[in-house]
Amino acid sequence: MTGAQLSDTDFERLDPRFGWMRDYLAMVKPPDLLPGRQHVDPHAFGALLAFVNLVDVDRHGEDYRFRFRLVGTHQTIAAGREITGRFLEDAVLPQFVDRIGRNMRLAVDSRQPVYDAFPMPHPGRDFIATERVYFPLARDGSTVDMLLIVNAYPGDVDLNRVLLPPQPSRRPHT
């Protein structure tokens, strides 16, 4: 399932935070369109916000560059450094740039969530196992301009601990 698009069955086998985010985004999105950043209320995430990254998709013709706009506090702690504002190639170890870039491009091009798992891609942090889902966001409902990444750390009970908030009972945006 590495670097793969996800089915409902896949989500059932993964950390519950990934399914929570899938369900939240499905609830807030306009009918038949992708959700955009404007539909996302970070207050609804509760403690899950500490595990969330937002990445800007800078389009250059057929090419993309990815810049970390927001990095959750747990992600910063796990990485052992701050990567907010950095482009992908400056944010992670060189041996992970292609893999993470492929995942991001797949989420952008397919307009579907993408899952991957690998060691933490930061200096001296490869002892931390990570898994993540890249969720596409599109301000216009169609062209992906941002990725919302949810991170989990399956091998570290303390770092991975999160109490998922209840799903809002109504659509916060119409």
Model-based region annotation:
Residues 1-91, 98, 102-174:
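Intrinsically disordered, low-complexity terminal regulatory regions
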